[in-house]
Design a protein with these regions (language model features):
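Short, low-complexity N-terminal intrinsically disordered segments enriched in polar/charged residues
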Residues: 1-29
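A beta-strand edge to alpha-helix "cap/lid" segment located at domain peripheries
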Residues: 3, 16, 34, 48-115
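Short glycine-rich loop/turn motifs that provide flexible caps or phosphate-binding loops at active sites
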Residues: 13, 42, 86
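Short amphipathic alpha-helical segments, especially helix-boundary/capping motifs
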Residues: 23-28, 41, 56, 70-74
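A short gly/proline-enriched turn/hairpin at secondary-structure junctions
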Residues: 32-41
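Short beta-edge strand/loop motif at the mouth of beta-sheet-based domains
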Residues: 40-49
Length: 115
C-alpha cells in the first residue's frame, strides 16, 4: 500500500467512525475542499466545521467501490448512506479527487449525486 492510499483509507475510515481528529490528521493545514457549484472552504479549521454533521445519527455507511492513484492524485468512487436525526436517509454516490502533498490531503474535490 502506498502512503497516499494509506492516508485516503485513514480519511475514509475517520468518516466511518465519525472521528473528527482522525479525519483532520490526514489534511494539510491549508487544505482546500471543493464541491463544484456548491461549496468551497479553505484551511483545516474551516474544514473541521463541515465534518461529522450534527444533523445525522449513528455512523455513515461508506463503501468505496474503486480507488485510482496517479502520482500525487488519488480518486475514490463510492456510495454513502447515513440516517438523519429527522428520520430520513441520505443516500448518495461520490467521486472524490484528492490532491496530495507531503503525505497529506492538500485539496479535495467532491462530486456528489443524491439518490
Amino acid at each position: 500500500m502506498t502512503l497516499n492510499q494509506d492516508i485516503v483509507n485513514r480519511y475514509m475510515d475517520g468518516f466511518r467512525k465519525t472521528d473528527r481528529e482522525q479525519i483532520l490528521s490526514c489534511l494539510t493545514d491549508d487544505v482546500v475542499w471543493k464541491i463544484p457549484n456548491a461549496f468551497e472552504t479553505k484551511g483545516k479549521a474551516a474544514f473541521a466545521t463541515h465534518i461529522v454533521d450534527e444533523g445525522f445519527t449513528g455512523r455513515p455507511d461508506i463503501t468505496v467501490a474503486r480507488l485510482i492513484e496517479g502520482d500525487d492524485v488519488f480518486v475514490a468512487e463510492g456510495t454513502v448512506r447515513a440516517e438523519r436525526t429527522d428520520g430520513t436517509t441520505m443516500h448518495l454516490v461520490f467521486c472524490d479527487v484528492f490532491d496530495m502533498r507531503d503525505g497529506k490531503i492538500a485539496q479535495l474535490t467532491s462530486y456528489l449525486v443524491q439518490l
